[in-house]
Amino acid sequence: VGDKVAMCWPSFEAYPLFTALVEAEEIRVPLLDETFDLPSLAAAIDADTKLAFVTNPNNPTGTVVGTDEIIGFLGSVPPTCLVVLDEAYSEFVTDERVTDSTLLLPDHPNLVITRTFSKAHGLAGLRVGYALGHPEVIGMIDRTLVPFAVNELAQRAARASIDAASEMRARVAAVVAERTRVTGALRDGGWNIPEPQGNFVWLPVTADAAALGNDLERRGVVTRAFAGVGVRVTIASRDWNDRFLAAL
């Protein structure tokens, strides 16, 4: 009771669910230009804030903050606040401001980096992820894990995907190339969209989000509409991306 969890919003929809599960108070800080506003997030953190989420790239907006900004943020929050750096889409990042975050771990024992095999590795149905952090923190996470949560099939698939890393990188490169093409086409068409760094693009249409999502679905293109906020569109094959652009 009295513990708080801080995040910028909108972001990954599971964060509020996790917060409610542990009966903590949720602190939401608005995004700035569709991007995590780390100075404002740091200002919202107090002695009762036990955890802060930083999603990089952010889901659903696809934007990133640079590693230098993350270092500054880590230096401005109390050491008693665990910072979870969610890098679910890290393989798709091409922004040179973002460097290897694991190099921050030795100097920041309150930092935990989470990654997944659900996105670039394509194993979403198997629910395989991992965390990197200080041994003491990882040990506490281990004690809360459900036994046998990652079954043998999922483990074998994850190992096979690691062994086939070159194939994964080729798929990611193809997605990034299509992301660049689709982004250019949208901007040529007058859309003002943030620079995407995930495997999707974000249409910040706010009040028209639900209507746009429904309209696209009627035209055979399924997207993820966030009512009152925007529409997230996954980068698919060239043909499907062209169908989306034509439907838009």
Spans of model-derived segments:
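Hydrophobic residues in well-ordered beta-strands that form the structural core
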Residues: 7, 28, 85, 113-115, ...
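PLP-dependent aminotransferase-like
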Residues: 1-54
